[in-house]
């Protein structure tokens, strides 16, 4: 059975969870990854109730060691990977703490870099032609008032994804 890894999974009605369910319905064992174990367990249980396979992985996408460990836990056979992480919270630039802006960038873009690096290494090691997808937002294409941190982080992630596509 092929394996898929989806990172950035929150509530059952969110995009990450719905991607997991759709992928599982296409004969993948899905590794459901995110920050909140309770949310992950709900998604995993829903997938299992549908007669499919899934496991949860709690992860901090900005921690390189966590990301490396996550790909080890998935093991061989990874064929499909999705980075669906983002923190879309409004805030005016002049009112925004630097720590908030940095967290937004680290979560959306830096975490995407760490994830892609480990997934690509896995694909190359196994000599597979796996698929790596980054979910985006219209925020990656244009700035929007009160969303400067999210806009800039998603724009950077889009550029990273384009660079990766040209390299591999």
Where do the PLM segments sit?
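Catalytic loop of short-chain dehydrogenase/reductase
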Residues: 8-10, 131-156, 161-162, 166
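Catalytic Tyr-X3-Lys loop
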Residues: 87, 94-113, 133, 157
């Amino acid at each position: 059975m092929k394996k898929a890894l989806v990172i950035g999974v929150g509530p059952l009605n969110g995009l990450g969870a719905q991607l997991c369910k759709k992928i599982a319905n296409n004969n993948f064992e899905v590794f459901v990854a995110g920050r909140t174990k309770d949310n992950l367990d709900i998604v995993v249980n829903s997938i299992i109730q549908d007669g499919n396979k899934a496991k949860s992985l709690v992860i901090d996408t900005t921690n390189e060691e966590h990301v490396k460990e996550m790909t080890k836990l998935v093991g061989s056979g990874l064929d499909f990977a999705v980075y669906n992480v983002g923190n879309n919270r409004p805030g005016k630039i002049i009112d925004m703490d630097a720590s908030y802006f940095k967290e937004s960038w680290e979560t959306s873009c830096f975490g995407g870099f760490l994830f892609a690096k480990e997934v690509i290494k896995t694909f190359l090691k196994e000599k597979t032609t796996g698929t790596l997808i980054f979910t985006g937002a219209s925020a990656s294409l244009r700035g929007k008032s009160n969303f400067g941190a999210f806009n800039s982080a998603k724009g950077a992630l889009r550029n990273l994804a384009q660079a990766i596509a040209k390299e591999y």
